């Protein structure tokens, strides 16, 4: 292992330095820091959860590279605000359009994807970034636990429904934005929505982020031959509206080293534009490098039986059936 690899790995395993801005700054000066991202003129990018934080920063980054960006908000007002903020930060001459969908609703997702397929000629990058962390257990309009519906079911439906457009634009990239918190959880066997687990906002958030990583790998296997490359990534510790609202104590403790949203979004934008994303499939990225999905001292890898159970369960929900 090279010296630069040792430094990078040490930062990653330290968590505190690797997930904060010091890790990104150190990695950027290492000799093997990946180049790019390059220009994206003529390409179309769809970003969910684009109203603030990492999602907004990603939209700004893509627009700055020349991509046509669709910013998704759950209401017309939120989508318009996201588009205005993107233009304000990226420049008035960028191509940014608001699109509307409550991603926790299956009907809304179907209506949105139907319209999107009718209105758009291509889709080069899909970024699934929308996230929630309710204080108490809540359910979507379809009766699905809200964190699961937003983080796991919604990306699943968007990928499935938009695959024809992604395949037509191949090579294309899907980026599921997850969290380093996924390292602390395993998927619960026989209980995908954690109905048998007392509700804990942080635990449910992390568990659904773990599920995102697993579903990403499953999609990557299925879509590779169509030229659609599916990846997951985590942004590290970024100073977002969600962190301020849902994790104020954590934010206060990590404030000296917490990343800006743009620093958190760096790998999202890079993956959307770099050849590394289309040369690989199903990887879990942080700071422009693939990372392990488990660590020695963290909960172990999920069994193939549990992984397949999750896939079948989400598929059944997406198609209006309970497994």
Q: Where are the predicted features?
A:
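Catalytic loop of short-chain dehydrogenase/reductase
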Residues: 36, 131-148, 167-226, 234-252
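Conserved glycine-rich Rossmann-like NAD(P)H-binding loop of the short-chain dehydrogenase/reductase
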Residues: 65-81
């Amino acid at each position: 292992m090279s010296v630069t690899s040792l430094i990078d790995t040490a930062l990653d395993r330290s968590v505190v330095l690797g997930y904060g801005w010091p890790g990104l700054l150190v990695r950027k000066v290492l000799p093997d820091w990946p180049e790019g991202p390059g220009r994206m003129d003529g390409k179309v990018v769809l970003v969910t959860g684009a109203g603030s934080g990492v999602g907004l920063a990603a939209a700004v980054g893509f627009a700055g590279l020349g991509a046509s960006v669709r910013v998704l908000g759950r209401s017309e007002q939120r989508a318009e605000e996201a588009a205005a903020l993107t233009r304000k930060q990226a420049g008035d001459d960028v191509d940014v359009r608001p699109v509307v969908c409550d991603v926790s609703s299956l009907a809304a997702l179907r209506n949105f994807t139907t319209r999107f397929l009718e209105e758009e000629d291509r889709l080069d990058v899909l970024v699934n970034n929308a996230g929630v962390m309710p204080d108490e257990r809540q359910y979507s309009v379809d009766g699905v636990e809200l964190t699961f519906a937003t983080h796991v079911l919604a990306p699943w439906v968007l990928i499935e429904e938009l695959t024809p457009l992604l395949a037509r634009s191949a090579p294309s990239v899907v980026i599921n934005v997850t969290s380093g918190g996924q390292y602390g959880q395993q998927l619960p066997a026989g209980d995908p929505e954690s109905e048998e687990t007392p509700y804990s906002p942080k635990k449910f958030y992390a568990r659904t982020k773990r599920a995102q990583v697993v579903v990403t790998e499953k999609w990557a296997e299925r879509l590779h031959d169509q030229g659609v490359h599916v990846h997951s990534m985590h942004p590290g510790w970024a100073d977002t509206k969600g962190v301020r609202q849902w994790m104020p104590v954590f934010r206060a403790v990590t404030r000296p080293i917490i990343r800006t949203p743009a620093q958190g979004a760096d790998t999202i934008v890079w993956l959307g534009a770099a050849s590394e994303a289309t040369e690989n499939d199903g990887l879990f990225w942080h700071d422009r490098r693939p990372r392990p999905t488990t660590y020695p001292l963290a909960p172990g890898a999920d069994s193939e039986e549990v992984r397949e159970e999750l896939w079948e369960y989400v598929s059944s929900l997406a198609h209006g059936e309970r497994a």
